[in-house]
Amino acid sequence: MKQFIYSIIFLISINISFSQTKELVLKKSFETNDLTTLNIDVDNVTIQFKESDDSKIRLDYSIIFKNNSDELIYKVFKGIKAKVSKNKNVINLDVKNSMYLGELHNLDVDINVYTELISDYFKKYKENKFPHKTKDFLLKEIDFSLGTDMHDYIKAFKKKYPNKNLGEGSKRFEQKFIINVPKNLKIKIKSLHSRITFNYNINKPIKVSAFKTYFKFKKINNNENEFNLNMGVFQTDRIIGGNYILKDVNKVLIGSISNAKLSTETSKIQIGEIGKDVEFNDFNSKLYFYNFNKNFETFELKGDYSKLYFYNKKNTVSLTAYGNTTAFVIDKQKASFKPSKDGKKFKMLEKKVKNKENYFGHINLNITHGIIEIKPQEKEH
């Protein structure tokens, strides 16, 4: 009898595994050289970039269906428009999918379970005091992350309770789009409602213009880099060089940054370590600066309605704050500065370093209508 039961279980597991089907959308390869550029224009696509082991770019795009339904396959492929072409040294990838294929909000749990989890998430979020984080801790967060904080909360919950039944999400299919890219390739990206992940370090120029796209990078290293992101998620282990415009980006995690200019607005940004030649121009964002490199020298920030959070590492960093109409919270002690009679900016705060032996550099702030909090390093992740 036991042998019969085991046979049934074995047959069921085989049927489940074989119920998945893989349908090819696009499969192409092209030879490239140092002058080749890849132009990408995509909507509602999930793409994973990997480093190619030769000079060819390879594109492999499929849809994996969790159950074999002709009606579902027809509905999905009706919403896919994908083509790729090459003209001289330019490769153009154009994928315009319907919103039905979008995976930004796919949480892979039952709706009732999701309702409970999101309630717990917001309770814990309110309790979060954003303690100090090391650069290594932030890098681990980036590596673990699937996208939004809610995605990561559910992933962590599943890891903590592996045997708990959380049901299944509404999606009955997933996109699998892998692009193997030579390191010498220049890349331009225009994206909408997409997920784009790079699994290799980028040293060639990359230009990105995106709306509601979740980006995840390793190292981005080029002075010609240009990013213009509106909403979505932006996570990267390291930035060296480039210009970055971030507007309404509700999750930005940067392991370390140097030689870069950032123009930010109504975003939430966490940086593990700030290095040399970093300039910020911000409006109404929350900015968490956890650490400064030992040789960062000078950090410049101009802000209006900005909320800045620094973490006090005694006798390593000097700070000067010019402006007006700004509140300060230093080691839980509060002070505020009203505007001057003539409306001009003035020196609101100056923090000097007595011991120059451990001196990292100087922070220069120009801020109005802001909040600057220098938090004690009570806890460290």
Task: Describe the predicted segments one by one.
Residues 1-26:
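Bacterial Sec-dependent N-terminal signal peptides
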Residues 20-34, 50-191, 197-203, 207-210, ...:
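Acidic (Asp/Glu) and glycine-rich low-complexity loops/linkers
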Residues 32, 39-42, 188, 300-302:
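Structural recognition of beta-strand segments within beta-rich domains
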Residues 192, 211-212, 230, 265, ...:
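Transmembrane beta-strand segments that form the barrel wall of outer-membrane beta-barrel proteins
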Residues 234-243, 247-381:
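Short, surface-exposed interaction patches in beta-rich subdomains
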